Amino acid sequence: MRRLCLLLATVLAALTGVVALPATSALAASAPPSSTGQRWALKVNGVYVSAEVNDSGDQNGKLRARSTTVGSWETFSLHTDNISGVGYGTTVSLRNEENGLYVTSEVDTSGAQSGMLRARGTNSGSWERFYVVPQGGGQFALKSAANGLYVTAEFNYTGGDQGLLRARSSSVGSWERFTFVPVDGAGDTGMPPQSSVTASGRHDIASWNVCANNNPSAACKLQYVDGDTVGANVASGVNGYLNHRPEAIFFQEICEKAVKPLELELESRLGGGWDVRFAPTYYKVVATDGTSDTGLLAQKTCADSTSHKDRGSFGIALAVKDTNTWYRGYTLPSPDKKEQRPALCATVPETGTVYCNAHFSSGSYFVDGNQAGDDPDGISRRKQSDALKGIVDKLQERGYTPFLGGDLNTTHASVDVLSSLYASHQECGQPTPGSPHDGAPTDGNNKIDYLFGPTGATYACEVVDPSLSDHRMIHATITL
C-alpha cells in the first residue's frame, strides 16, 4: 500500500490488553468492500438495477431498474447475518458497491414511494433483510422481511421514479422476477504471469487466528471490538512477539473493516509497504422452499461492535508486500448449510513467491453434549486439503515458490486428512520431510494451525502467544 503511514493517536499500554483507540472516521470510511467477495448485478425486464447515489435527501441511494450496463452503481454483494433460532443463510442483505451501504426497505414511507428500496443502511436488520423465492428459470423474487411483501420494479412510473424498486406486492409477476448476474469479485480472473525469479534465501511467514468476531471464549480479547482497535492490537502483537519481521502473515477469524486499519498499523509498526487483502466466509443462500442449491452465496457478517458499528463480513486476511500484482479468493468445498470456507492467495513477483491462506471447516467438538463441528468425520477437510493443493499446484506451475497454511482445524489425531499437503510440501513442525507430523500446540493442547513450504528446505518453527486470542501465533522460518 503506497500511502503515508498512520500516525498513532494512542500508544498501547500493554500487549496483553485491548486498548480502545478513539473512533477514526477516515478509517471507517476507507474500509474497502470485500476484496474478493462475489458481486452481483440485479436484472429485471432486461435492465439492471441502479442505486441513485447522486440523488439528495430522502431520495439518496434509491434503487431503480433503468441501466443497460453494469458499473459500481449496479453492483451488489450479498450478506447474511444471524437470526436467533434460525441461523445464517435464510435471508440476504444487499450491499451496494458504490457507497458500501445496505439496501433498506423504507416501510415507513407513504404514498407512491411506500416501501421503496434505498442503499442507505449502515447495519443489517429487519429492514435490510430479504427472503429469496425461486421462480424457475434462474429467476427469483425478493420478499422484504420488514413487511412480507415482494419487491416490484415500477416500470409504469415516469421521470426520476421510473423503474423504482418498492416492497409492495403480494404476488409475483414479471416486475417481481429478478436475475442475479455474476460480476466477478474473486480477484484477478486469470493466472499470474510466469515468474521470472527463482525464490531463494530465507523466508519468514506467520499465521494467526485472531478470534476477532464474537467467540465467547474469555481468551478472545478482540471479540466485538471495532476495526481500528483490532488493527492496532493485532499489529502490536505481531511486532512484539516475533523476532523477525515476517514477509507474509495469514490471519483468520477477522472482520472485513479491520483490514484497512490493520494495513496501516503494520506499516507503522513493522515498516515498509503492506497490502492486506480479505476473503469472506460464505453461506449458501437458502430459498424459502428450504433448498440451498440456489447458486447464490452470501457473505457471513460479523456481529456488530459493542458501539453498534457494522464490522463488515467475517473471513480471512492475507498481508504481503504491497508489490504484489495478483491475488485471488477461492471458496473451498464445504458441508452444505454450513460455513463455506475461504482460501486467499497472492503473488510477490520480485521474490518469485506465492502465499496462500486458508481456514478449513471445524472438526469434531461438543457444546452441551451436542456435536457442534461442521466436519466431524473429516470428509470436507480432506476435500479442502485437496482443493488447496490443486490451487497451489497451478501457481507453482507458473514458476512461483508456494508458502501456504492457516487454521486447518485438524489435530494430530486426524492429520491424515491433510495427506495431500504433506505429500507435496513440508510443514514447519517437521525438521525433515520424513519427520512426524508434529509441532507445538496452537489452540489449547492441540496443534491446528499449520505452515507449509517446499520439501527439503531448512525449517524452524515457533509458537508464540500475544494473549489476544484463543489461538497462538505460529511462525515459520524457511531457508531455501
PLM features: residue spans?
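Secretory targeting and sorting signals
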Residues: 1-30
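N-terminal, active-site-proximal structural segment of metallo-dependent hydrolase catalytic domains
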Residues: 23, 183-268, 278-293, 300
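Active-site beta-strand termini and strand-to-loop segments that position acidic
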Residues: 96, 144, 319-322, 344-351, ...
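Metal-dependent phosphoester/phosphodiester hydrolase catalytic core
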Residues: 342, 346-381
